[in-house]
Amino acid sequence: MSVETQKETLGFQTEVKQLLHLMIHSLYSNKEIFLRELISNASDAVDKLRFEALAKPELLEDGAELKIRVSFDKDAKTVTLEDNGIGMNRDDVITHLGTIAKSGTADFMKNLSGDQKKDSHLIGQFGVGFYSAFIVADKVDVYSRRAGTAASEGVHWSSKGEGEFEVATIDKPERGTRIVLHLKSGEEEFADGWRLRNIIKKYSDHIALPIELPKEVAAAEGEEKPEVEWETVNRASALWTRPRTEVKDEEYQEFYKHIAHDFENPLSWSHNKVEGKLEYSSLLYVPARAPFDLYQREAPKGLKLYVQRVFVMDQAESFLPLYLRFIKGVVDSNDLSLNVSREILQKDPIIDSMKSALTKRVLDMLEKLAKNEPEQYKGFWKNFGQVMKEGPAEDFANKEKIAGLLRFASTNGTDGEQIVGLAEYLARAKEGQDKIYYLTGETYAQVKNSPHLEVFRKKGIEVLLLTDRIDEWLMSYLSEFDGKTFVDVARGDLDLGNLDSEEDKKAAEEVAKSKEGLVERLKTALGDSVAEVRVSHRLTDSPAILAIGEQDLGLQMRQILEASGQKVPDSKPIFEFNPSHPLIEKLDNEASEDRFSDLSHILFDQAALAAGDSLKDPAAYVSRLNKLLVELSA
């Protein structure tokens, strides 16, 4: 080893100290994952070199054959992993091995479940896989040199995984990174060729470059140990380039875990090769659970992009719409240029064609999952339903297909679970029903007891109950499904069409005519608080209700605008009353205009509360109510 210069001792960032403590003391039940993580990092380093060497072939120096080597020394109790990838300079080493993004650490800690097996798989997802070395090692040495720098600019990083690390400059003729793990007492099992071989086959068989181990050759008695011969122990071919019939489910699952840094198997996957005008292969996965940053718009998303099997970029966002940002996978194109950039991807017509086809493939995969595995789809919807609801606004071409994948709670259920699809809703619709009825609100408890549903309960008509914040916005982009229009049961003048008999309609007209005087009195009493007063066809049990104007914003949208600091357009509700309710009959017979006004305002405020709205003047409501209670108790 060359002489070390510019040696300095630095302290780990606080977050790294916490992480190291966690690695060493908490994740000991699944120790072998250290090798999976280090191989995954080495594979990324080789991918980066391949990509940078497209523009600068000299980076390959004299070693064009890219590989990872794993070796061990039983006597010294060490395991060594070496790659000839991009390598690191001094700054890289300090940055990557001494600090990690604070947000990443916080999220990592927050996501720990206490289940050691699950937690051990989280480490790759948060970019902290290197530190898993300390699960089995009490000291780690890293020797690295970045491709394109002088041999004298190598760097040696060393740490015992406690509070600090040492960095020194060394001579390192070969580019890339060598990691030496000094195994803890009791971890000698890993200094064994068969053990390492089995771990590599188990976790890293899909890695698309050779992972080599020394051949197990026993020296004859009295002979010198033969020179080390290396042999490739993984399959070392890009999984997506192989015929589907040759790839086992277990291989697809392990590959998913590698690219997604997930510990669970995916729910579903689609492996496809397109030939003809466009030529590309794709392997797309639906995860079983949502990533921690699903709702952070700036979070990394997109597919791994390869061009003619050469890695080009992670998180290529242009191949799928934003509402499918949870999909993981790779796309390998023969038609794109190797020097393609993110900017070019956004403008290339080839990408538009690929995006359209890949989007359809994902939606087909989800349709198949919903049809064949309804329980699994239920789990998918819990994790990704709100993101899927962004689809109709973003993807007009596939609006009907996306609508078929949506799931809602309904009046047929009892617990608010979103399990009703639109096709299922229509399949059990009443004879003559030509509309899909829905109601939006803040909570399931609030909407399921809403007075707006009274006439629907009486007639046995199912209503979809929409309580996600995004729902009212979603419905502004969904006008119909399978030829049936959507109707908000709280909006406008409710018309049940064929579901109301001619006798019902005639009787309603007669009642409305007989209550014209009461309508006028209520208009006068409520004044500017309402846009209109009318007899209700919605109510059977409640005295009054507030309906929304046909063009007005509902409560959900108003709250979203208010929360984002935007101006909310002025609107007034429609006050509807139930002519057969005893309170309304009493109100109609009230001679005192002052008392009539008080009762009218109490009914108006109660209707607002039932709709989930807040009162503009709670003190006035309480005062009127107290006054009424005093009169009643006198």
From Swiss-Prot:
Claim: S-adenosyl-L-methionine is one of the keywords in the record: no
Keywords: ATP-binding, Chaperone, Cytoplasm, Nucleotide-binding, Stress response
C: region residues: 560-634
InterPro entries assigned to the protein according to its UniProt record, in alphabetical order: HATPase_C_sf, Heat_shock_protein_90_CS, HSP90_C, Hsp90_fam, Hsp90_N, Ribosomal_Su5_D2-typ_SF
Localization, UniProt: Cytoplasm
GO cellular component, one term: cytoplasm
A Gene Ontology molecular function term of the record: ATP hydrolysis activity
Domain of life: Bacteria
UniProt-annotated stretches for the region A: 1-342
SUPFAM superfamilies, sorted: ATPase domain of HSP90 chaperone/DNA topoisomerase II/histidine kinase, HSP90 C-terminal domain, Ribosomal protein S5 domain 2-like
Region (B): 343-559
UniProt key word Glycosyltransferase: no
UniProt function note: Molecular chaperone. Has ATPase activity.
Family annotation (HAMAP family): HSP90
Family designation: Belongs to the heat shock protein 90 family.
Name this polypeptide is given: Chaperone protein HtpG
Species the sequence originates in: Pseudomonas fluorescens (strain Pf0-1)
Gene: htpG
